[in-house]
Amino acid sequence: MKNIFFIVSFLLIFSCNNPSHFSKSETPNILLINVDDLGWKDLGFMGSQYYETPFLDEFAKQGIVFTNAYASAANCAPSRASLFSGLNTPRHGVYTVGSAERGDKRTRKLIPAKNKKYLNDSIYTLPELLKSAGYINANFGKWHIG
């Protein structure tokens, strides 16, 4: 599946037109959008001729767009856990949503990896880092990591 690489496609956009306008005491707003199964050209500013995304296109014009990224896992929960923890999948232990023991045990081809359904409380996460820097955080939508 070609879009698997882009499961953790995200945009980090600063809300001001020109980051050089910040004084040393000002901090930029950060909008981190993490989208599951977003294709490389599914957004207007990335060249989509099918989908219309005018508001995201405007954000992209005013901010910073990252176009070179790495998906640390082949599905949503472990990728999200890696993004928020900074750890690779074997380090945080979130391999899938729910149990990895799916389907009929007799016909299963692989031994399921032991899976955690959440990040350990001891893991220092990106939202905690941002909070310590004075940011207010919010999460909307899917979570699946604790």
Language model: regions and residue ranges:
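Formylglycine-dependent sulfatase
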Residues: K2, C16-G146
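Sec-dependent N-terminal signal peptides
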Residues: I4-I13
